[in-house]
């Protein structure tokens, strides 16, 4: 039986593509394994998916670009994780390893290289993260959402891989109930922050609820069940599954962080959006670079986190809505989207070519 190992985690963004690809491999008879941290979000997402995947937990350590005594302890964890991953590779003997990045992916990627397993890596951001810089050295091939320097000759620019916008969504009954609380004459805003950046949006909506709902219907995907509410012109929910795409369709404008997965989903839908990227104090600055790229391309507006107030938000919304035709046209003209099926076919072809 053909076998493949997936890895990637730390945030939902480092798991999403894996969850889209795994069912396709299973359908074609592959045995699928996943290497990550049993305490990490990757384990939660795999368990929640119900997919027939064997999960292997290994020691992982956070990768830092600055000096910290914690680096010594985490260095030992990474080394131990490599030995654990080597044992997994030698036992499973997969045809390939696919990594979506994140610090949890470093031990299995290195182990795969050491054991002669072809390594395929995906990088979503404009600047390559530290984990994927290490992975590049071990990679048979790396796929990139953004164009990268030609000197990195193992990288193929594939654009964003997304399933959103490729098919009609089925409307859950709950959507009609939500609509009954909304004013049809007002535009609808959707705030979505992702696993690492929702709190700022949650606080903003809580502090400005009256001002927001006076002018807009507001949807807030919070990640915090204590904030769940459905009231006049306001719907707040911790997590949504079947409702996600219908709510996106309902929204006139989405206010989002700058994670690559989400903003390219919005591009695929040609959905008006404002990007409020995580700042450099909370990240390596990749979301700022992603947002700058989208603004330069004419896809979106951008607000710095410290600019997130009613005055700046209203100015950005006024511009988006007044010039929506040009934003929509720029997004519709984009050639930066690849379907999951297209990417799966590419990956499979490369794995077949890479077999020894």
From Swiss-Prot:
GO biological process per UniProt: carbohydrate metabolic process; cell division; cell wall organization; lipid glycosylation; peptidoglycan biosynthetic process; regulation of cell shape
Cell wall biogenesis/degradation as UniProt keyword: yes
EC number assigned by the record: 2.4.1.227
Keywords for the protein's UniProt record, in alphabetical order: Cell cycle, Cell division, Cell membrane, Cell shape, Cell wall biogenesis/degradation, Glycosyltransferase, Membrane, Peptidoglycan synthesis, Transferase
Record's subcellular location: Cell membrane
GO cellular component: plasma membrane
Enzyme class of the recorded protein, top EC level: transferase
Keyword presence, Cell membrane: yes
Any one GO molecular function term: undecaprenyldiphospho-muramoylpentapeptide beta-N-acetylglucosaminyltransferase activity
Pathway: Cell wall biogenesis; peptidoglycan biosynthesis
Record: residues binding UDP-N-acetyl-alpha-D-glucosamine: 195, 287
Topological category with respect to the lipid bilayer: Peripheral membrane protein
Catalytic activity: Mur2Ac(oyl-L-Ala-gamma-D-Glu-L-Lys-D-Ala-D-Ala)-di-trans,octa-cis-undecaprenyl diphosphate + UDP-N-acetyl-alpha-D-glucosamine = beta-D-GlcNAc-(1->4)-Mur2Ac(oyl-L-Ala-gamma-D-Glu-L-Lys-D-Ala-D-Ala)-di-trans,octa-cis-undecaprenyl diphosphate + UDP + H(+)
Superkingdom per UniProt: Bacteria
HAMAP family for this protein: MurG
Family membership: Belongs to the glycosyltransferase 28 family. MurG subfamily.
UniProt function note: Cell wall formation. Catalyzes the transfer of a GlcNAc subunit on undecaprenyl-pyrophosphoryl-MurNAc-pentapeptide (lipid intermediate I) to form undecaprenyl-pyrophosphoryl-MurNAc-(pentapeptide)GlcNAc (lipid intermediate II).
Protein name as annotated: UDP-N-acetylglucosamine--N-acetylmuramyl-(pentapeptide) pyrophosphoryl-undecaprenol N-acetylglucosamine transferase
Native species: Streptococcus sanguinis (strain SK36)
């Amino acid at each position: 039986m053909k076998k493949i190992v997936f890895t990637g985690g730390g945030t939902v963004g480092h798991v999403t593509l894996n969850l889209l690809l795994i069912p396709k491999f299973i359908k074609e008879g592959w045995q699928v394994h996943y290497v990550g941290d049993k305490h990490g979000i990757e384990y939660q997402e795999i368990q929640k998916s119900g997919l027939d995947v064997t999960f292997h937990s290994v020691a992982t350590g956070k990768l830092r670009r600055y000096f910290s005594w914690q680096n010594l302890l985490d260095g030992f964890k990474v080394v131990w994780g490599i030995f654990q991953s080597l044992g997994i590779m030698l036992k499973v003997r997969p045809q390939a390893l696919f990594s979506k990045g994140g610090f949890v992916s470093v031990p299995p990627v290195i182990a795969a290289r050491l054991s002669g397993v072809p390594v395929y890596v995906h990088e979503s951001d404009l600047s390559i993260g530290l984990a994927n810089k290490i992975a590049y050295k071990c990679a048979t091939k790396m796929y990139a959402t953004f164009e990268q320097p030609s000197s990195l000759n193992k990288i193929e620019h594939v654009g964003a891989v997304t399933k959103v916008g490729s098919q009609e969504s089925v409307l859950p009954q709950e959507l009609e109930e939500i609509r009954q609380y909304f004013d049809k004459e007002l535009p609808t805003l959707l705030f979505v922050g992702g696993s690492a950046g929702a709190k700022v949006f949650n606080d903003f909506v809580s502090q400005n609820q009256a001002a927001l709902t006076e002018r807009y219907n507001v949807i807030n995907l919070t990640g915090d069940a204590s904030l769940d509410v459905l009231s006049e012109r306001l719907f707040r929910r911790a997590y949504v599954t079947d409702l996600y795409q219908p709510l996106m369709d309902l929204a006139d404008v989405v206010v989002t962080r700058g994670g690559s997965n989400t903003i390219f989903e919005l591009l695929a839908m040609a959905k008006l959006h404002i990007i409020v990227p995580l700042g450099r104090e909370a990240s390596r600055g990749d979301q700022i670079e992603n947002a700058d790229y989208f603004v330069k391309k004419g896809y979106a507006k951008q607000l710095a986190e410290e600019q997130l107030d009613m005055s700046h938000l209203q100015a950005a919304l006024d511009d988006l809505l007044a010039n929506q035709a040009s934003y929509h046209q720029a997004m519709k003209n984009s050639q930066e989207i690849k379907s999951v099926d297209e990417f799966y076919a590419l990956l499979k072809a490369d794995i077949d070519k890479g077999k020894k």
